[in-house]
Amino acid sequence: MELTLGDLQQIELICIEASAWGLREEVVDEAETLINDGYQPVVAYEMAYNDWVK
């Protein structure tokens, strides 16, 4: 699957916001698991962020 520049920017913004909460590693780890489960990368990062940063 190829990611667009917009996808990469959105993922990076999610990671920056997660980092502000000290949760970047947790969000990335969960997003990678969700991607392996078949979710689209941007959706996976959004879900992981929403799960960790409530």
Locate the predicted segments by residue:
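C-terminal alpha-helical interaction appendages
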Residues: M1-K54
